[in-house]
Amino acid sequence: MSFIRIARSLARGYYNLPTNIIDRTSINTSRKDDDSDTKATGSQLDSPDEEWLKDYNSFVNVRRRNRSVLRTFVFGIGLFLIIAILTLWWPLTGADLPQCHSIYMYPSYARVDGFNEKFTSLANKYHLYLYREQGMDKEPLNNGEIQLDGIPVLFIPGNAGSYRQVRSIAAACSELYFKQSDILINKNAKNLDFFAADFNEDFTAFHGGTMLDQAEYLNDAIRYILSLYDQPDVSTTLAKPKSVIIVAHSMGGIVARLMPTLKNHIHGSVHSYLTLSSPHAAAPITFDGDVLQLYKRTNEYWKRELNDKSSFIFNNVSLISITGGIQDTILPADYAMIEDLIPYSNGFTVHTNTIQDVWTPIDHLAIVWCKQLREIISRYLVETSNIYLPSKVVPLEERMKIASQLFLSGFEDSYRNYSGEELRNLTTNSEVSSEMKLNDIVKITKDTIPDKPYLSVPVAQFDGNVFLTLFSNSDNIKILGCANSYRHDPTIHSCKDLSHFIKKVPRYFDPNKEHKTESNKLLHTSIDEFKKYDFVIVDFSTIVEEHDLLVYATLSREEHTVIDVTPSNLLFMSQKIKVPPGALMNKWEFINLWDSLFAYKMNVDTTAMEQPFEPFVKQHIKEPFETKWHLNVLESTTSISFHNIAPFIPTNENITRSLFLTLVGSPENDYFIRISVDYLMTLKLLYIRYRLAIASFPIAVITMVLAYQFYIYDRRGIFLPFVTALGHLISTYNTIICFSLLGLSFLCDMKLVQNALFAIDPSHLNKPYFNSNKDVRNNFYLLGLRSKLLGVLVYFFFTIGTALVILLNGILLTFQKLFTMAINLKRTNMLQNQRTNTTAIITKWRFLALFLIIISVSTFIPYQMAFMLAVIIQVINSLKVSSLSARTKNHQNLLNFNMSLLLLLIFIAIIDFPIIIVFLHNVAIRCGTSFRSQHNCLAIIPILLMVNNNSLLRLPNRTKGNKGRLVSLLGLIYLSLFSLIYGIRNLFWLHHGVNIFSMWVFYLTIFSKGS
């Protein structure tokens, strides 16, 4: 029976039911009307006010409201758990599976002790290392002196990253130059001297001051590195380097772009940037306003420089941004985009799925060591080096050409127009050459190798919509562009090798095997690409007879079909496509499938009993460069996801945003394709993009409920329990809330509304259009949605936020109830007596402690640390009120008020906690970092005054007249709307909003006379 009584007691505590909680000796009857002042003290034990008790019960004792809360809780927590389970345990398949190979190296690191306080003020906090691959690179030190003989490269680690992450790429560069130099095309290449910054695993993403420190240190480091090559003992007589190559991971890429904006930057000291999983497009977290300010400053600087055709950056600097795609669960791959900022003449974004011989997504940490990718990166770094130039890299145009050749799939429009190498004179006649006609299909196997080794395509006979398509599993096929150079003999041609148009594509692989390393060859090129030639010749002369040899060649008009289907069409029914025989490649453009929040599933079937080769599907979008190769499509359902138009990412509205799918299959067979929405994958993708909503939406819910609590309190003198007030709002206004959120989603996607929201944004950091380019726009508001169909997500996340608040409130009330039950009932009046006798002493010591905290914030600790102290004080306040309520049952209003405030402060503490991590990290390594903006006393004094005042067991006075009530109501509603509309991209400002609210509460408690 005792267990049942405890359970019943806990349940009453959770729902704040009136039964046996409020008796007639616990009601303050000093009020003579509904607008009387409310002030709870330990000595108020008068007889009850019958009308007040009736009003209280009319709000609290409504089971329907409790059922509404329970339904909302179950629905919200259910959604939250589904997304969490899918994120953590739902497996990725097919092209989204990681396929990185293992690696090994023999690293050594030499700390550059010469880079000390004489060269940088941050030498005590950060350090510089020189990497050497054992057995290949020079020994790092000789008699204590650094030995340098290559081209300087600086590696910048990311958030909490280590300088040791340089080893994989640096080792690959050394191995390429010293052991595989015969494959290098660039004869002016040189080995690379890799330097790496040691930031003591600083949390760069959390703190703008840390970003500034790192950028300042790196500028000093570059100055020092370049000075090392000016020393006479450096073994080179060539041009001294005037710049370094930068390779950066994660937030290191943002620090690298920040460097040129600082005063200590050496003009022209960096020509080449290569970033790995760096969030260029948007800050991954928004807990610190300084980070957002630095993003804005950096982007404006780069945009201004790139708009100036005479600037150094426009004419010399390249930036390649590589992202791991869907496997990166730390940073949304959308955030790595630079297309809105940097023109294609200076850089581009590419997904690792796209890169030839990589063809795999890569997670956030593996991107610095994945074997396939590091081999391509090392090739790029070495091939773009030039020992004879002071910049130590080839000119910008050549650098971008090499980047396109190495990092793109080869099927992009920007890849075209590279001239082939002069080959030889070639003699063709009817005995050795056959002419290919429109709609011809040529098939070659080991049993049908043609007697005529040349297949000729007369270019002049066809228009630009005719495509030459070639599929082969052989490496011994060439494409030649030939012209009739000898008028006396039309069978003799001058030819160039155009085999670079033939690209690798991943071969069908067994998912049970560890690796897939083999590739097929694919050519799909418009005849327009060959207009300067008379003939295009497919050369089979060197083909080798193999048991699985297969070659298909077709000449046909491109099968490009535009499909006008929307995600809403695919929600409940699938799009079916029939592919008749006759074409080697069939291409579809889905002009309305552009939203990255949707994922789709595709099934491919065929009536053919046998397949000459396994058909596969190429999926791609035009910006950024993202190509996926879906293999094994006949065996299983294929998941389709992409990174196109995404929340909070700038988008050029003049660029085609269609999703393209291309089926490569036997022209002898027919195929059937079915596409529909993949609900589970769509839910899985929500987490990575909306993690910050877990912090902002609950605050919107809490402040909305607080507004209602204050409204009822001002009118009737009842400060409702939090769950009771929430239940009343849900049961009464749920439909209004739902449609209001949907309407808000539609409004926030309108350009006029976005401009208005930016005008009234107190932070003024997120401009909906990018500088003067009105075609590049962004939606920073609410969930950043561009699709009206997904407006329902706002209500879903609001429900999840509500459920999380209910959960935390239940946990707090449970602990409060357990604490109350644990109190010794014999000491009923001890606390009241102690408070009566020592009030003056406690107040004196509290204000002394408050003064010391303010001094500490001004000089040493960030205000976020003081806020954590305020949260602890509020916890104590709530427990103290709980203990008094448990004995005298006369502080229900005071308990409800303190518990609601505690809920709000706990969620704000989640936002402030990362800055505290940075501060404690710096204390642990005994290094100081500037916390300039965090030493703002005004950002914490009102909160400290409020919680200190709460510790004296005071309630705010009920406001006099409508004006005071309006201030409380509108202030909290504004804070709730701000949390919804601006919160995700301005989490740092929510602290300041609560700080202003705290000042108002303090004013109501101390200075307001009430009514």
Curated annotation (Swiss-Prot):
Disulfide bonds: none
Locations listed in the record: Endoplasmic reticulum membrane
Main enzyme class: hydrolase
Enzyme Commission no: 3.1.-.-
UniProt-annotated stretches for the region Disordered: 28-47
Transmembrane found in the keyword field: yes
Topology in membrane: Multi-pass membrane protein
Glycosylation sites: 28, 66, 316, 417, 425, 654, 837, 898, 949, 957
Active site: 250
Cellular component per GO, a single term: endoplasmic reticulum membrane
UniProt cross-references to Gene3D superfamilies, sorted A to Z: alpha/beta hydrolase
A GO term, aspect molecular function: phosphatidylinositol deacylase activity
Pfam families: PGAP1 (PF07819), PGAP1_2nd (PF25141), PGAP1_TMD (PF25140)
One GO biological process term: endoplasmic reticulum to Golgi vesicle-mediated transport
Coiled-coil region: none
Origin: domain of life: Eukaryota
InterPro entries per UniProt: AB_hydrolase_fold (IPR029058), PGAP1-ab_dom-like (IPR012908), PGAP1/BST1 (IPR039529), PGAP1_TMD (IPR056824)
Keywords attached to this entry: Endoplasmic reticulum, Glycoprotein, Hydrolase, Membrane, Protein transport, Transmembrane, Transmembrane helix, Transport
Transmembrane residue ranges: 72-92, 692-712, 717-737, 740-760, 792-812, 847-867, 900-920, 964-984, 987-1007
Family from the record: Belongs to the GPI inositol-deacylase family.
Function of the protein: Involved in inositol deacylation of GPI-anchored proteins which plays important roles in the quality control and ER-associated degradation of GPI-anchored proteins.
Protein name (database record): GPI inositol-deacylase
Organism: Candida glabrata (strain ATCC 2001 / BCRC 20586 / JCM 3761 / NBRC 0622 / NRRL Y-65 / CBS 138)
Taxonomic placement: Eukaryota, Fungi, Dikarya, Ascomycota, Saccharomycotina
Gene designation: BST1
